Every structure is written in structure tokens, then in C-alpha cells.
A protein has these predicted regions:
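Sequence/structural signature of beta-propeller domains
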Residues: 1-181
């Protein structure tokens, strides 16, 4: 390669309302794109609408720890990633223990607590036990599945699905569309 690799440079710095930001997701809406951020100190999700011309609304905070049935103490989240569907669901993921919490932001309630496990005999058997080498990125997939980026040992994209379901693999048809849950 004789050409230099293109670089990205900071073109704008946007102050975030969460402590120790660790995950970002985008939800497409009729009004524009909504950027969602989560930090690894609290369960507060910051949300900001980006208008069609790039104008930013004020950040709003949704404190997931105030939802009925929220299983974690306030101020102890250790979230590594956030995902959003095309409706009102957000999912936040912890690395240790490996769990995804799914919340509906309208109306505000906890929808699911999903334990990410590696069944005996699976490709991940024996490789998912390292608490410092689990999920770092998260995407909703169709069919109740999740795509997780594993940090190391091995570096991989992992498909998690409902118990008993066979892995489907990944294609562009698996990604949720705008307004799709």
C-alpha cells in the first residue's frame, strides 16, 4: 500500500451527560436520529435528537435504575454497551456477570433480564468464562437474537439466541429496520 490510510479527525466535540461513557447506539425516528449513550458508573441513558440539518437538541437522561424491578443498585452498573431498536426498547450489557437488561423507555419498565451463557459443547464452551473478556458491543437482531462483540480470547462477533434455537448466522436481513422492534 503506497497510499496513506485515511484518518478521522475530531470535527466536533459533544459533551456527554453520563459518567464514563462506554457505549453508544443510534435510533432512527421520524423526527431524526436519536443518539443514546450509557456509562459504566450509573444506569443513566443519555438521549439526544439530531435534526435533519445536524442541530442537536438538549440531552435528556433516563435513569433505568428507577424502573420497577431493576435488579442492580443505583451507581453500580458496569455497562459496556447499549443497543436500541426502532421503537422504545433499549438494551444495556454488563461484562461481569454477562447479562443484558432490556428496558422499555415508553412506558418505562424493565422488560427482560437475559443471561449470556455458553452452553456445553458450543463454540464458546470454555472461552466465555473469563470475566475480563466478554461482551463489549451489542446489536439487536431479528428473531429475539443479539449480536455481541467479544473483546478478546477470542476476538469475535457472537450470535446469542433463544434457548434451543440454532444459530442463524449474520446477514443484512437480520438487522432491525427503522421503527422495527
Amino acid at each position: 500500500m503506497s497510499e496513506k490510510t485515511p484518518r478521522l479527525v475530531r470535527s466536533e466535540l459533544i459533551d456527554l451527560p453520563v459518567v464514563e461513557a462506554s457505549g453508544v447506539a443510534v435510533r432512527q425516528t421520524e423526527r431524526g436520529a436519536v443518539v443514546l449513550v450509557i456509562g459504566d458508573r450509573t444506569a443513566e441513558v443519555g438521549a439526544c435528537l439530531i435534526g435533519a440539518r445536524g442541530e442537536l437538541d438538549d440531552w435528556t437522561l433516563i435513569d433505568l435504575a428507577t424502573l420497577p424491578g431493576w435488579p442492580l443498585p443505583s451507581g453500580d452498573s458496569q455497562f459496556e454497551a447499549i443497543a436500541a431498536d426502532g421503537g422504545s426498547l433499549v438494551a444495556v450489557m454488563r461484562e461481569d456477570p454477562p447479562v443484558v437488561l432490556v428496558a422499555d423507555t415508553e412506558p418505562r419498565h424493565l422488560r427482560a433480564e437475559i443471561r449470556l451463557t455458553a452452553p456445553a459443547g458450543s463454540v464458546l464452551d470454555g472461552q466465555w468464562g473469563d470475566a475480563s473478556s466478554r461482551g463489549e458491543g451489542l446489536v439487536f437482531l431479528r428473531g429475539g437474537r443479539l449480536l455481541v462483540a467479544q473483546e478478546k480470547r477470542p476476538r469475535a462477533l457472537i450470535e446469542f439466541g433463544p434457548v434451543g434455537a440454532e444459530p442463524k448466522g449474520l446477514s443484512s436481513d437480520d438487522l432491525l429496520g427503522p421503527e422495527e422492534s
